[in-house]
Amino acid sequence: MNSFKIGSITIGPDAPPFVIAEMSGNHNQSLDQALRIVEAAAKAGAHALKLQTYTADTMTLDIDEGEFFIKDPNSLWAGSSLYALYEQAHTPWEWHAPIFARAKELGMLAFSTPFDESAVDFLESLDVPAYKIASFENTDIPLIRKVAATGKPMIISTGMASIAELDESVRAAREAGCTDLVLLKCTSTYPASPENSHIRTIPHLAQLFGCQVGLSDHTMGVGVSVAAVAMGATVIEKHFTLDRAEGGVDASFSLEPAEMASLVSETERAWQGLGRVHYGATLAEQKSLVFRRSLYVVQDIAEGERFSKYNIRAIRPGLGLAPKHIDAVLGRKARCAIKRGTALSWDVVG
């Protein structure tokens, strides 16, 4: 599973986790708000800003009954038709260029999730550096082939997909030209609970499909994302908003700016902590060896006096013989007078 780049940023185990701030519909249909979200994401240290590219008409039909109406009382969007929800949540296509331009000015990558083939054509006209396939679209093989044919890196959320479905999607992507692929473990509930996140799947995904892996995290807070890095995640995606109290279609499970800054710093710290398999003192620990216990003279000893548990003891610092040698020393005679506080060495043991 080779590392690769999105823009100038390396995606892989030898680079810090690639953190994506997902705007979704948290702009609340205000371009000014959208641009402020971009600025806040950049200030928080996110590496990329992601949009979703669709219209209500490319997503569904304008019907407000039956399966086109959200009746689940536990849903964040209960009482809305699918069409009305997507009307509220979509990012107008004419906003994409100024949003992407502002992100670029701030040194941040920007790309999007297309939900149909027309969105891919539109995003190609804006020369996006990568694409994301949403979890509900990961079985849309024609869409995956369309994105793969661009030759750009592709990120796919796994959501509810079975191994067989993921295998079909990954094969389709690779056969159509995708060489740089990331699979994101994703739980398609909003919000998701930590218990349903199952991030132990992350290394299994990497093993099965030989690609970079990560997490699209819908849980509250940053704990699951940080843990995902320890499981091998090289990409972390989180929804982002300026203030959850302002509301918005996805605001309730989105990170605020200070939380995004924490996500960026703590996932990088987790990555730094991974290191490699290592035993023994590191270079940084060499000075700490002195704080080990070792054998010291704890009472003045005369020449010829025998060593006993009363005049030698294992204490700190660690400049004397290792404590494991005490049985070999006890009962033997001192070659010379030894002052209390002297580190014991073989040359004074008779």
Across the structure, where does each feature detected by a protein language model lie?
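Catalytic cores and adjacent flexible loops of soluble metabolic enzymes
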Residues: 1-350
